């Protein structure tokens, strides 16, 4: 658990150091900034780690090819077991990144569950077709229902495995059509724990 806590601290540190540099450039004294920010905590949904089913579920807002690659790569460096990734692509957004995301997730992860992530007004199956165009491996499955995808991912965990649940982070909704439906990745992990 220490290694995963360290990864979360690295995420926080990188953001903190960037903020520190910007504030200093704006004329604030470093010592004053450090004093005022010493109790700052990481935002919900950024490298947020939950111990579950003998492994770890990590919820992160990574939703671009670059961010997904960085998160999976970082956890591959820490892993003692497998890295299982749950990821999708948003609807009514840049379709060019979809096959790239599919390729990155399936190439860098030991196993991937491709799912929905705010399909909005697009057909989730069409979004998935776009994602699958980039997939060159067989270490994946498609589960369009995000809640079910999270349950499946947790069920797969073996001791020391890491389940990366990417894309929504702090969001507590799924947009289907023009309607926001309650869906919170962290809550789904906690619900699984309550039922098992």
Predicted regions and their residues:
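Single conserved hydrophobic/aromatic residue that forms the stacking wall/gate
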Residues: 1-14, 112
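ATP-dependent carboxylate-amine ligase
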Residues: 18-31, 35-45, 49-196
